[in-house]
Amino acid sequence: ELLATYGEKLVGGEDETHFGRPQDVAFLPDGRILIADGLDNNRIMIMDNDMNYLGEFGSEGSGPGQTNTIHAVAAGPDGRVLVLDRSGGRVNVFRTTDDPAEFAFERSIGDLTLPLDIIVNENDFWITDLGPLRFVNFDFEGNLKYTWLVPRELPDGYIEVHTFSVDPDGNLYGGDNQYGRTQKFVPKAGSDAELLIEPPWVGN
């Protein structure tokens, strides 16, 4: 059952009720909804849990907190919000403030080629990147922890991991929009837990 529709089909815009090719959605523990209105508008729209517009942050550019193409957004611990700048090759980290319509820029992380998606965990985060195709693991200070290269030619290879997630049992799912398939990977017995991607962070 369709409950509501926001925006207008084939009608783009940059006001409070229209979008410019939005790419992703994230949910904050207090119920606010963040919409990555990113291909045309390079902004994160802030909505309450009834989808009323509260404000927005972000703009186009290469300066602090700016983006060239927002492709993903994710919420994390301690009020963090991570915004993935695909064309800018980095992740911008913001923090919530006492004002529900304001977010404070903290830092940019990564020297990436073409980042596509992000999962935030309790102490770090993972990104899929192209050139070479890989999963990249950073802590919240921006320190590189681990790089996991992804094969292309094997039967279970990828051209790009356009989106990915992990279920409560630790199984990894990766969607490839070039090969047109999603694959499931189960952790090997005895795997180092520090090198495994955890399920996305969920606030209390």
Give a label for each model feature.
Residues E1-N204:
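Eukaryotic scaffold repeat domains enriched in small/polar residues
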